[in-house]
Amino acid sequence: SNLLFIKRNKIFSPKDNCYIGTTFKFLKKKININFKNINLKDIHNFTEIILVGSGKGVTSVSRIEKINWKRKSLKIFKKVNHIYSKNCKLS
């Protein structure tokens, strides 16, 4: 899976040392994804975290208890999930 981090309606993904999966490559052609270094201390600045992968498709992270992070919105998740769902027919 790949991670998307949302801040001020902009989508970010870690810049370095990440395997770019098939689902991520597909979404990258459809939406604007900014690449930047993301540190654990920065996580609290994001309103949404989205997992994208071949197995589950597009999934919103609701919380990360260990660092006390909680999702604040579903706006971008709904947009990304809609793009993924309408283009990927599940059999």
Language-model regions, residue ranges each:
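Helix-start/capping segments and mature chain N-termini
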Residues: S1-S91
